[in-house]
Amino acid sequence: IIIGHMLNFEGTHADVFEVFIQIGAILAIYTHYRRTFNGFLKRKNWIKTRGVSLLHISAGMLPVLMAGYLMQYIIKEYLFGPIPVIVGLIIGAIFMIYAEKRTVSGRLVDSVNNLTIYQCFQIGLYQMLCLWPGFSRSGATIAGGMLIGCTRRAAADFSFIMAVPVMIIVCVYDLEIGRAHV
């Protein structure tokens, strides 16, 4: 957003370009976690009590998708400028430092397979911070996971597994919106 503003590359075409950039990230994450994603294709893994399931992923995605949809006008109108993005970067960095210092001590969730559906939902609530452009989605979810009692590894694994469906949904939505404006 900041570079796009400096180069005067803004508007619908820039939005579509940003969507296509995300495809590389989606493919990289999918490649790394392909066993987990391929496991989701089995119906028995859609809803299960042990290990990460589609239900866990859905619980994590729900807050950000609903908030993003409901607040899309406000976000696009007021937060997609260089100054709000810089503020988001700074606040995001402070939040991640805070999470490092305030990580819950004691018994930590040490694997993505040990997350409860409620914990996934809580991480999803933290993910809403990334609706502020500049605030890192992975930073928000990893830091949020650490604040609710996950190890950095468990929070990162869940963050990246959850990223693929979220980014796919956002990309498809943005492409459809972009197509409507072309």
Positions of predicted regions on the chain:
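Multi-pass membrane proteins that catalyze or facilitate reactions on polyprenyl-/lipid-phosphate substrates
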Residues: I1-R179
